[in-house]
Amino acid sequence: MDEAAEPQWLDAEEQWNWFQFAYALVRVPAALEAQAQRDAGIGHFEYLVLSALSMAPEHTLRMSDLAEFTASALSRLSNAVSRLEKRDWVHREPDPADGRYTLATLTEDGLAKVEISAPGHVAEVRRIVFDPLTKAQQRQLGVIAQRMLRAIEPDHTSVEERARRAFGVNG
């Protein structure tokens, strides 16, 4: 932006909508964190890692793909996976197809933890995200999220395609 140019300030309605959205961006993860701690004894990020692995083919993902899915730096993910390894829920090993990569695999105990934890997580997601919205609003939420993701990352479509391949999902 040109330093002499005046910023395009938000009007009153935009300010109000931004405030509501920004507050939701803080409160939704906090509510999911509280639920995961209360019901499963783990953090929401750890649950997200376990859940992602549970959906992956053979319950295994490259750490780099898992980092992308969780929108996390590899260092944060590595610390979380170390905690999960100590509980025998995940194990890591070099990727036999390409030793430059590390694979994270969900163990049987890890899968059992996901199966025990998932109902509470889904109930909380439903309570705070889906139940307050009509079906039309839910669809619109998905469209809005996609547009925002593309504004953040213009080639989001290719990121989405890589995630679908990693998880064995057809789009």
Predicted segments — roles?
Residues 63, 81-82:
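Short, hydrophobic-biased segments on the C-terminal half of alpha helices
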Residues 10-13, 42, 61, 106, ...:
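Alpha-helical hairpin
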Residues 1-12, 135-171:
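C-terminal regulatory/oligomerization modules of transcriptional regulators
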Residues 1-42, 89, 169-171:
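N-terminal leader segment of winged-helix/HTH proteins
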Residues 16, 48, 139:
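Active-site phosphate/pyrophosphate-handling residues
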